[in-house]
Amino acid sequence: MATHSESPTKALPFADRPVEKAPGHWVLARAGKTVLRPGGLALSTWALKRAVLPGADVVEFAPGLGVTAAAIIGVGPASYVGVERDPNAATRVDAIASGVGRCVNADAAETGLPDESADVVVGEAMLSMQGEKA
């Protein structure tokens, strides 16, 4: 799986908020945990290899800082669309996806994408990011 190094000059999303007011996954990113992989890297790698990504139209929910987006793009999908609700993170992933795809600033529940526009949908850490209201 491809790796992606983060520029230290780019502020993380919600970096301006106190820890108690920032979403948990962005607090973890401040501490150096920039990728949420429930089940670990081995499970993520296993699942992505079996998803038949080369030549597919891929949508990824909550790509965060774009580490998995870079890995997906590295195997040659026909297209890639990230759906990220944080505008700073969406901008980062949009830059990573340029040339192959894009990242839209939207909620996974209302992406704005046409029905049946993806062959593969990736939601690597979606459930781990849901609050009590989910």
Residue ranges of predicted features:
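Class I SAM-dependent methyltransferase Rossmann-like catalytic core
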Residues: 24-39
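Class I SAM-dependent methyltransferase SAM/SAH-binding core
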Residues: 65-111
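Conserved class I S-adenosyl-L-methionine
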Residues: 55-64
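A short beta-strand submotif of the Rossmann-like class I SAM-dependent methyltransferase core
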Residues: 123-126
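N-terminal, positively charged/glycine-rich alpha-helical extensions of SAM-dependent methyltransferases
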Residues: 1-27
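Conserved alpha-helix/loop element of class I SAM-dependent methyltransferases that forms part
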Residues: 37-54
